[in-house]
Amino acid sequence: MASDFLPVHRALLSVSDKTGLVELARALLAYNIELLSTGGTATIIREAGLPVQDVADLTGFPEMMDGRVKTLHPMVHGGLLGRAGIDDAVMAKHGIAPIDLLILNLYPFEQITAKKDCTLADAVDTIDIGGPAMLRSAAKNFARVAVATSPDQYPDLLAELQAHHGQLSAEKRFALAVAAFNHVAQYDAAISNYLSSVSDMHTTLPLRHEFPAQLNNTFVKMTELRYGENPHQTGAFYRDVHPQPGTLATFQQLQGKTLSYNNLVDADAAWECVRQFEAPACVIVKHANPCGVAVGKACSDAYEEAYATDPTSAFGGIIAVNRMLDVATMQSILDRQFVEVLIAPDYDADALAYATKKANVRVLRIPSTGVMNRYDFKRIGSGLLVQSTDSLNIHSDALKVVTQLAPTDAQQRDLLFAWHVAKYVKSNAIVYAKDNRTIGIGAGQMSRVYSARIAGIKAADAHLAVTGSVMASDAFFPFRDSIDAAAAAGIKAVIQPGGSMRDNEVIAAADEHGIAMVFTGIRHFRH
């Protein structure tokens, strides 16, 4: 099969994306390839002074119904589906000439339906019928026919034609066929998702369910991983076909070893946490939990404070900052500790040069523009849980003071900082903080009071004074015991959602200890 090169004598071009069309047509003609085309595609080729035959002349049947019917004809599909050495006689009998190359992309359904003023009629008009049919015909017959669905594929296609004197290999035809079927599957999934979400088709703009009756998501494999979460598991990394800008999946790896499954899980936790801060910030993550977070005048300051929270856990961690990482900060990190992954929006040249001293460190660049993904997905046995992303933040004017003592301005800033961090800590989550840095973090405990105790232990191990610090809890306190433990540690202000049956007991405990407490009315469970 490796030597199965076939010449291209005839090509059909029908594209909605006209990028590179004229250049492609001119290049194909240089190999004496006959061009067929439809509608606007043929017009552009002809206006460029290039010879092209209209499909309507081939079929003997005009385009009709505003272009809805133009290629659904045996002269077209027979030319694409005809098998060399098998269908030659029947093709000759009916005057069907082979089509060796199909260049086609589909009506822009996703772009049209993404517009706020898109009506149901607009969406339906953008559903391509003839295009997917031709793509499937050409891709099914990859033994003889090649098919390209995107301008991104033109350079490689032309390079192979040039390298092999107007011929394409079986491997190239097969790879293009797979891409074509993937393209059609993605297109049909987009149509299904849109129509399944329509709850009222009679309004001017269709009312749509947040969660469609059927969900079809498309992912593209970026790389296979050495193994999964553990060495006995296999693993791979897939990305949304349309990744949200600024999310982890858009990373560029600048150096270092191949990323592991656990690297990616931890990197996502670190990046999502750090990019919520407006001021320069640093987040250090271990096992998907922040073990140190700080905000400073510069990322160098933030790193120093974040590291000091828990130097033991920071070893072998993932470090993310939300500003360009300079050489001084790079040197401070790499000279002090072992790090698995570094993440930043960018790096100065000297920082990257210094990073090469530790060639195994994985250095990722992620443009910081963009918003959070709208939805989170979690697999369960034979099922998928879908929820809107926990993107709700709170500001000082929304805090409800529930104790006799109100927090000071400085405490209020620390409370909001700790609250932002708690959202990214596994439940039950307790965060001790002071002066825009974490003092101790208690994560993932089945009992909230134990998370509070662990936060205190972490602070003591790092020789950090808890006295005067604030405490954040991702969910309400079911009993007063966590407040008693916090008071014993020296906590002076608490932020929590509220909503417990025993809120009054918890508030009374805070008043007894002279602790200021505010309610957010928002819970931040993380599992």
Curated annotation (Swiss-Prot):
Entry similarity comment: Belongs to the PurH family.
Gene Ontology terms: biological process: 'de novo' IMP biosynthetic process
Annotated gene: purH
UniProt keywords, alphabetically: Hydrolase, Multifunctional enzyme, Purine biosynthesis, Transferase
Keyword flag Chaperone: no
Organism superkingdom: Bacteria
Protein name (record): Bifunctional purine biosynthesis protein PurH
Comment, domains: The IMP cyclohydrolase activity resides in the N-terminal region.
Catalytic activity: (6R)-10-formyltetrahydrofolate + 5-amino-1-(5-phospho-beta-D-ribosyl)imidazole-4-carboxamide = 5-formamido-1-(5-phospho-D-ribosyl)imidazole-4-carboxamide + (6S)-5,6,7,8-tetrahydrofolate; IMP + H2O = 5-formamido-1-(5-phospho-D-ribosyl)imidazole-4-carboxamide
InterPro entries (alphabetical): AICAR_Tfase_dup_dom_sf, Cytidine_deaminase-like, MGS-like_dom, MGS-like_dom_sf, PurH-like
Domain MGS-like: residue ranges: 1-149
Entry-linked SMART domains: AICARFT_IMPCHas, MGS
A GO-annotated cellular component: cytosol
Glycosyltransferase listed as a keyword: no
Pfam families in UniProt: AICARFT_IMPCHas, MGS
